[in-house]
């Protein structure tokens, strides 16, 4: 019958019995039956409250590692005495106090190759006494808040020869651990059977995961004088853990297992049967005059890619590899423009081919379409498709192989075309031969593909760039000084707010006059400065003052293009036309632009008017990729006099070219041709790439960022930027001055001015949840733990998720607090760089927490990645940084993950907030990054820091030493050296690293 007493109660009773024995001089008694008699007849009557039985008490002590128990003997470890004894201060060890740079590098290697240092050597090993749980090579000490636990690590020489303990290194930067060494001084000889004790006090007043490492350095057996003796190391990894109730519910559901090695195109066979493609819109009248090539990556590049990633090999051709590397490393110029950018696009596609395999499905059932009851369509559930992981759009295809035929010599592969996407389900058309034999529940092995259309139109744009000689626009050297308007023209503004903003007004006037041509005009718009407002006003003024002008207005995303349309239709309702791709879900299109886009509500489908009809509109609005349809229709090269690209810093340079090459001409002399306008911020996130090789060699640069970084026309001089070519907007209309302070200093030369509405920006300055009234930033320090589960490589941190949830309850709970404004969930955003943390936080607020899940509009609270919040703002932003472990930091740095060493991601995250910014993270780890270090110290100095104790000194150099050690592993201690840019656990087929699930493109 199970005991009615908890393990904690059993342990506490046993420790009190141990003290009872010591007080009576019976602490040396080990006879089990005599101890039972003392317990039942002497101890229990004096206990005062019901006590467990003797055997139950022993069980509790045994599982807590506080007693050694046999059928006849009991030996208590007597550790609890340490909890009440103050050891001499001279025996206390200050963690890290005597660690040299050499030893820091050694510790970094030990973090990486833990198993090697957990085993004893030469008969020397470590005995552990005290309450702990051994898990994955780590000693976990579970703590109740404000209750002390004591652990003893006894280094014992169980060998036959003497050894010498030369150094003892406890490594811990948190106050939850206190270390006391034994009586002996170091170096300390240990003969056979001798031991050296380390006593560890553990106590915490806050929840969290507090790691520590203990390293013993020893001199092995050798001749006298020890000249030939071997130095060896033994380590133990500790962690004190105190969970909040919510965090305990977020622990990994299944142990993390690395995904199996991926097999490329595993379902493709010699026999492929196709289904029916979705019907082309009956109203598709737009010409297709210019062919679009396939532009597949060259076979040789596929073969050489592993060598490019991993280094030379005897099985590769050095000459070809050297040629490719030379192309990659050469500075981008007009003479190598097409060759280099085409190569980078191929590298990106090869990475995409590899990454898409991550979503392949095995033994998944399909069913007949249950909703439309369409006998031609089958339904497949695809987890993650609603979040574009993977992206599946109407018109895309996938490959399926019957599970029952996978072992056949020549099975049939079925190519299914996507007709409809509904949340996590797709409806597919397959060949009639499959449909004729199909029954509900038939299972398949499925390979996903990605849409190559965006890549193909970028390759074509590179071809057209050279054909139309656009170098004066892409590598500008001067303006030709030709104005489109008289110098004395007066502007009547549509948006009167520009009257009080000289920078916006200046940019608009230069754009309309066109004096920058053939060079592009750049609107450099830091967060919240109104770059889209400026761009929209410029478009309206061009339409007004230049009657013959025709404008193409683009953005990389549908949301960006929709916003342009919404802003323009206010004053130009009959002059604009929004051209949408057929894959766009009409339910996602804002209602107010449906009347001026290519959706035919009567037919229930998209229409594509002929070129002649589209040319009648003064302004066409598309995404960059959809602009390729105008190129295919061969619009006259001089039709568009102006091309505007919003969010221009967020797209690859070849993507910008899709809307330029073939649609705009640059005259060799005289009239400089059309005006290109780029609006964006090079200090915020650039394009999302998958290939680290393409990223390293420049594909991550947008056209806007390249011009600002390398072209002299756009360089900042002693008097600022040249307003003829570029305007930097300076007035921030979004954030409280305190929130703006650090990013302003770090990225914008301190020039930004806080101009947000005072009432809006100060609505949380008196909130009682602030550590410091009037300072609307909170950094809540949490010593959490990085976790992973299942086969997902993405990280999550339960304690941070619980802390974020706690703040959300304070902000959104119906019972208002003093100083807190009424807040709707739609005005709150939660940002985390890891997909799994996003999922866990959503789970907390929609399932686990009773108060939050009960709110009617809780689904309006957006939880997403930094990329998903670019261009957006919320009254309140909460950020969960997730990372707490040194062990994986180098992985983040190598693959541009997380926040560390990623100033653009940091900048975007902290500048989304209007009135309140709450950051939850590990200050010890974030302090290794200079930008985060600046932010942390800013919060501390102004009273905005709370949570775990703030580190006395954020030692940036020490952190960098440890990180350096991780990336320079010694072959002598860690086995064969691995390629530095490819951590072993991330490698996939051909050495290609498996990225942590960035969202796939779903904008066409």
From Swiss-Prot:
What does the annotation give as the result of altering residue 531 to A?
A: Abolishes inhibition of retrotransposition
Q: What happens when the gene is disrupted?
A: Knockout leads to early embryonic lethality.
- Any one annotated GO CC term: cytoplasmic stress granule
Q: What's the protein name?
A: Putative helicase MOV-10
What the entry lists under InterPro entries is as follows: DNA2/NAM7-like_C, DNA2/NAM7_AAA_11, MOV-10-like_beta-barrel, MOV-10/SDE3_DEXXQ/H-box, Mov-10_helical, MOV-10_Ig-like, MOV-10_N, P-loop_NTPase
PTM (free text): Ubiquitinated by the DCX(DCAF12) complex that specifically recognizes the glutamate-leucine (Glu-Leu) degron at the C-terminus, leading to its degradation.
Subunit structure of this entry?
Answer: Interacts with DICER1, AGO2, TARBP2, EIF6 and RPL7A (60S ribosome subunit); they form a large RNA-induced silencing complex (RISC). Interacts with APOBEC3G in an RNA-dependent manner. Interacts with TRIM71 (via NHL repeats) in an RNA-dependent manner. Interacts with both protein products of LIRE1, ORF1p and ORF2p. Interacts with TUT4 and, to a lesser extent, TUT7; the interactions are RNA-dependent. Interacts with AGO2, TNRC6B and UPF1; the interactions are direct and RNA-dependent.
Write out the ranges of the annotated region (Interaction with AGO2 and APOBEC3G).
Answer: 922-966
The UniProt family comment states: Belongs to the DNA2/NAM7 helicase family. SDE3 subfamily.
The Phosphothreonine modification is found at 254
Enumerate the UniProt keywords alphabetically: Acetylation, ATP-binding, Cytoplasm, Helicase, Hydrolase, Nucleotide-binding, Nucleus, Phosphoprotein, RNA-binding, RNA-mediated gene silencing, Ubl conjugation
């Amino acid at each position: 019958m199970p005991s009615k007493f908890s393990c904690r109660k059993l342990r506490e009773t046993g420790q009190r019995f141990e003290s009872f024995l010591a007080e009576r001089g019976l602490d040396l008694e080990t006879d089990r039956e005599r101890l039972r008699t003392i317990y039942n007849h002497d101890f229990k009557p004096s206990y005062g409250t019901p006590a467990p039985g003797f055997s139950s008490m022993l069980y509790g002590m045994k599982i807590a590692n506080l007693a050694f128990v046999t059928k006849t003997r009991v030996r208590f470890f007597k550790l609890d005495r340490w909890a009440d004894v103050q050891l001499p201060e001279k025996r206390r060890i200050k963690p890290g106090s005597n660690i040299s740079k050499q030893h820091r590098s050694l510790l970094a290697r030990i973090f990486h190759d833990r198993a090697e240092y957990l085993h004893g050597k030469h008969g020397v090993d470590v005995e552990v006494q005290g309450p702990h749980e051994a898990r994955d090579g780590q000693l976990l000490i579970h703590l109740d808040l404000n209750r002390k636990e004591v652990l003893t690590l006894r280094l014992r020489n169980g060998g036959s020869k003497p050894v010498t303990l030369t150094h003892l290194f406890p490594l811990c930067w948190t106050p939850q651990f206190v270390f006391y060494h034994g009586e002996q001084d170091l170096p300390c000889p240990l003969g056979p059977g001798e031991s050296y004790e380390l006593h560890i006090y553990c106590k915490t007043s806050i929840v969290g995961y507090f790691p520590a490492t203990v390293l013993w350095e020893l001199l092995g057996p050798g001749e006298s004088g020890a000249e030939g003796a071997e130095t060896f190391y033994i380590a133990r990894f500790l962690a004190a853990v105190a969970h909040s109730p919510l965090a305990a519910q977020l622990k990994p559901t299944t142990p993390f297992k690395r995904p199996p090695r991926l097999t490329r195109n595993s379902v493709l066979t010699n026999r492929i049967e196709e289904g029916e493609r979705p019907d082309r819109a009956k109203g598709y009248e737009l010409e297709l005059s210019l062919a679009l090539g396939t532009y597949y990556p060259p076979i040789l590049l596929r073969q050489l890619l592993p060598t490019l990633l991993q280094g030379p090999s005897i099985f590769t051709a050095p000459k070809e590899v050297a040629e490719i590397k030379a192309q990659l490393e050469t500075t981008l110029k007009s003479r190598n423009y097409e060759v280099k950018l085409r190569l980078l696009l191929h590298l990106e596609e090869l990475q995409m081919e590899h990454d898409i395999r991550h979503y392949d499905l095995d033994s998944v059932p399909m069913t007949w379409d249950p909703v439309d009851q369409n006998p031609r369509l089958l339904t497949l559930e695809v987890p993650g498709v609603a979040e574009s992981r993977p992206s599946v759009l109407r018109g895309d295809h996938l490959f399926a192989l019957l599970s029952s035929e996978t072992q056949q010599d020549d099975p049939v592969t079925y190519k299914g075309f996507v007709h409809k996407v509904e949340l996590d389900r797709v409806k597919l058309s397959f060949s009639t031969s499959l449909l004729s034999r199909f029954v509900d529940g038939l299972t398949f092995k499925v390979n996903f593909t990605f849409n190559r259309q965006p890549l193909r139109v970028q390759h074509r744009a590179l071809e057209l760039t050279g054909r139309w000689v656009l170098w004066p626009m892409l590598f500008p050297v001067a303006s030709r000084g030709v104005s489109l308007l008289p110098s004395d023209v007066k502007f009547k503004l549509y948006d009167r707010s520009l009257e009080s903003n000289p920078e916006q007004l200046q940019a608009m006037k230069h754009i309309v006059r066109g004096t920058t041509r053939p060079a592009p005009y750049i609107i450099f718009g830091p967060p919240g400065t109104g770059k889209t407002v400026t761009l929209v006003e410029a478009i309206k003024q061009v339409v007004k003052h230049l009657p013959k002008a025709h404008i193409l207005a683009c953005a990389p995303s549908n949301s960006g293009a929709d916003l342009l349309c919404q802003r323009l239709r206010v004053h130009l309702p009959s002059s604009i036309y929004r051209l949408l791709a057929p894959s766009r879900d009409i339910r996602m299109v804002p209602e107010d632009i449906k009347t001026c886009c290519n959706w035919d509500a009567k037919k229930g489908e998209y229409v594509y008017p002929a070129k002649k009809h589209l040319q009648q509109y003064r302004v066409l609005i598309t995404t960059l990729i959809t602009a390729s349809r105008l190129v295919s229709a061969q619009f006259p090269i001089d039709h568009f006099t102006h091309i505007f690209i919003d969010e221009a810093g967020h797209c690859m340079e070849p993507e910008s070219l899709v809307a330029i090459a073939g649609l705009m001409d640059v005259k060799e002399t005289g009239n400089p041709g059309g005006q290109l306008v780029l609006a964006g911020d090079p200090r915020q996130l650039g394009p999302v790439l998958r290939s680290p090789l393409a990223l390293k060699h420049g594909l991550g640069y947008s056209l806007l960022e390249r011009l600002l970084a390398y072209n002299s026309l756009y360089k900042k001089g002693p008097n600022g930027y040249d307003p003829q070519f570029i305007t930097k907007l300076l007035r921030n209309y979004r954030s409280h001055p305190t929130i703006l302070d650090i990013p302003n200093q770090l990225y914008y030369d301190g020039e930004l001015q806080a101009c947000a509405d005072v009432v809006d920006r100060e609505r949380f300055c008196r909130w009682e949840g602030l550590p410091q009234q009037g300072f609307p930033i909170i950094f809540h320090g949490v010593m959490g733990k990085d976790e992973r589960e299942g086969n997902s490589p993405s990280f999550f941190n339960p304690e941070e998720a619980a802390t974020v949830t706690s703040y959300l309850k304070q902000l959104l709970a119906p019972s208002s607090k003093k100083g807190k404004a009424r807040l709707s969930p739609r005005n709150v955003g939660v940002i985390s760089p890891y997909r799994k943390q996003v999922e866990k936080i959503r789970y907390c607020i929609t399932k686990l927490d009773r108060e939050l899940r009960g709110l009617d509009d809780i689904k309006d609270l957006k939880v997403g990645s930094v990329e998903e919040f670019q261009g957006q703002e919320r009254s309140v932003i909460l950020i969960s940084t997730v990372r707490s472990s040194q062990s994986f930091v180098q992985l983040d740095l190598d693959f541009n993950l997380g926040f560390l060493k990623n100033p653009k991601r940091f900048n975007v995250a902290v500048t989304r907030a209007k009135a309140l910014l709450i950051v939850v993270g590990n200050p010890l780890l974030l302090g290794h990054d200079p930008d985060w270090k600046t932010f942390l110290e800013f919060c501390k100095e102004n009273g905005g820091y709370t949570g775990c104790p703030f580190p006395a000194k954020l030692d940036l150099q020490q952190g960098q030493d440890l990180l350096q050690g991780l990336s320079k592993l010694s072959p002598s201690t860690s086995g064969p050296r691995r390629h530095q840019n490819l951590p072993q656990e991330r490698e996939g087929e051909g050495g290609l690293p498996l990225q942590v699930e960035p969202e796939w493109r779903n904008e066409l």
